[in-house]
Amino acid sequence: MIKLRLRRMGKKRQPHYRIVAAEARWPRDGRFIEVIGYYNPRTDPYTLEVNVERARWWLEHGAQPTDTVRALLVRAGVLPPRQQNEAKRETAETAQPEA
């Protein structure tokens, strides 16, 4: 399975990340198929650059983003934000624990 995930770069205690498409079984900092963008959380404000066209192509072809990459793709405008299921929320509120 292909994953969109972060690949750590940089010096010790100074990380920045590349957003890559890689096989899920490959090591985090090992082989990858393609670099899609980069993310630097150490700058103020953070730096995020994503090739939107390639990210959408990978998502259309079945690549699964990790939770962190999903959040970054939402910030970049590639993915819509997750919507909470209204029905699930209502049942949780109406269900009262029996005492």
Swiss-Prot record:
UniProt region (Disordered), positions on chain: 80-99
GO MF term list: structural constituent of ribosome
Pfam families the UniProt entry points to: Ribosomal_S16 (PF00886)
Keyword Ribosomal protein attached: yes
Gene Ontology biological-process annotations: translation
Keyword terms of this UniProt record: Ribonucleoprotein, Ribosomal protein
Source species, domain of life: Bacteria
Protein's UniProt keywords contain Aminoacyl-tRNA synthetase: no
GO annotations of cellular component type: cytoplasm; small ribosomal subunit
NCBIfam families given in the database record: S16 (TIGR00002)
HAMAP family documented for this protein: Ribosomal_bS16 (MF_00385)
Record-stated family: Belongs to the bacterial ribosomal protein bS16 family.
Name this polypeptide is given: Small ribosomal subunit protein bS16
Gene assigned in the entry: rpsP
